[in-house]
């Protein structure tokens, strides 16, 4: 009297995904470690319903972006390269200057590098909200604080 077991692989459906809102305080957090955790939550890998080709992730609000920490001497030596697509249009920005002018860009750049670079990755990236100060306009969504080690 043995039963035949039938194991089916679960595939999440976009309409069934329940999304939560999380807030992360970036003050004194190591940039790379925090970005890896953010990418994991945006992708939905922390959920048992994770499906690689479906957006199963949650929303992330990052505050205090200007107070993020970088390990080692990266604050002095790390640079970001971008190009205007004109001849001689290559530019280098130091992370120290970028943290003063646009601190949100530092976190966004780190997280974008850890997401897939396709349509799904662009959809996931839209769920990341980064703010320089401690205030954010998403209090109506009742975000839960997420601790990052």
Swiss-Prot record:
Gene3D superfamilies: Ribosomal protein L13. Belongs to the universal ribosomal protein uL13 family. GO terms for cellular component: cytosolic large ribosomal subunit. CDD domains: Ribosomal_L13 (cd00392). One of its GO terms (molecular function) is mRNA binding. It comes from the Bacteria. NCBIfam families: rplM_bact. One of its GO terms (biological process) is negative regulation of translation. The gene is rplM. This is Large ribosomal subunit protein uL13. This protein is one of the early assembly proteins of the 50S ribosomal subunit, although it is not seen to bind rRNA by itself. It is important during the early stages of 50S assembly. Keywords: Ribonucleoprotein, Ribosomal protein. Part of the 50S ribosomal subunit.
């Amino acid at each position: 009297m043995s039963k035949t077991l039938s194991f089916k692989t679960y595939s999440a459906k976009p309409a069934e995904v329940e999304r939560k809102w999380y807030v992360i305080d970036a003050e004194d957090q190591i940039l790379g470690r925090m970005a890896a955790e953010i990418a994991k939550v945006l992708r939905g890998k922390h959920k048992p319903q994770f499906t690689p080709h479906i957006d199963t992730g949650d929303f992330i609000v990052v505050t205090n972006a200007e107070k993020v920490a970088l390990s080692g001497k990266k604050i002095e030596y790390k640079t970001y390269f971008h190009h205007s697509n004109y001849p001689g249009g290559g530019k280098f920005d130091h992370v120290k200057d970028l943290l003063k002018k646009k601190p949100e860009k530092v976190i966004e750049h780190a997280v974008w590098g850890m997401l897939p670079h396709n349509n799904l990755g662009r959809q996931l990236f839209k769920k990341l909200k980064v703010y320089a100060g401690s205030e954010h306009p998403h209090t109506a969504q009742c975000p839960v604080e997420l601790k990052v080690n």
